[in-house]
Curated annotation (Swiss-Prot):
The gene is mlcD. The keyword Metal-binding applies. It is found in: Cytoplasm. Functions as the light chain for myosin-D. Has low affinity for calcium. This is Myosin-ID light chain. SMART domains: EFh. GO terms for biological process: microtubule cytoskeleton organization. Keywords: Calcium, Cytoplasm, Metal-binding, Motor protein, Myosin, Repeat.
Length: 147
C-alpha cells in the first residue's frame, strides 16, 4: 500500500513519525499516533485512533509501515468516486461517458501526481485491452478505487 504514496509523501510521513516517536522505539503508541496525524493535518478522535491501531498496528502500537498503509488507504479513500467521475467528464468531449486512451494516458502521465509509464500501460491494458480504444470511465474509476 505504501506504493500508493509518492516519495515526497513518504518522506513527510517518516518525518512526522520520527518527530512524535517519543522513545524512538520505531513504534507509535496512541498519543504519539494522534500527534503525528495532527501534524499531518488530520484531527482524529480517540475512538478513530483506537480503530486505526486495531486495523493497522499491533499491541496498541504502529510501526512506520502501518502508518504508510493507513495513510495510503486514507489518500485513496479521500477521493470520492463522484468527484473523480466529474473530473473525467471534463475530458468527455461528446458527453457519452467515454474517454480516449490517449487522453487518459495524458492525464495519468502529465497532470497531478504523474504515474510511471509501466503503471499507465497496465491500467490501459486492463481498461481497453490493447490500450488504444475508448474507455468507459465510470467502471474504470470504480475498478481503480477498489484496488
Amino acid at each position: 500500500m505504501a506504493s500508493k504514496l509518492n516519495e515526497e509523501a513518504q518522506s513527510e510521513f517518516k518525518e512526522g513519525f520520527a518527530l512524535y516517536d517519543g522513545n524512538k522505539d520505531g513504534k507509535l503508541e496512541a498519543a504519539e499516533l494522534a500527534n503525528t496525524l495532527r501534524w499531518l493535518g488530520q484531527n482524529p478522535s480517540q475512538s478513530e485512533i483506537n480503530e486505526i491501531l486495531r486495523e493497522f498496528g499491533s499491541n496498541n502500537q504502529m510501526g512506520v509501515d502501518g502508518l504508510f498503509n493507513y495513510l495510503g488507504r486514507k489518500v485513496v479513500d479521500d477521493f470520492d468516486e463522484k468527484e473523480i467521475i466529474e473530473a473525467f467528464q471534463v475530458f468527455d468531449k461528446d458527453g457519452k461517458g467515454m474517454i480516449g486512451a490517449s487522453d487518459l494516458r495524458h492525464i495519468l502521465t502529465n497532470l497531478g501526481e504523474r504515474l510511471p509509464e509501466e503503471q499507465v500501460e497496465e491500467m490501459l491494458r486492463q481498461a481497453v485491452g490493447s490500450g488504444d480504444g475508448a474507455i468507459n470511465y465510470e467502471p474504470f474509476v470504480r475498478n481503480m478505487l477498489k484496488k
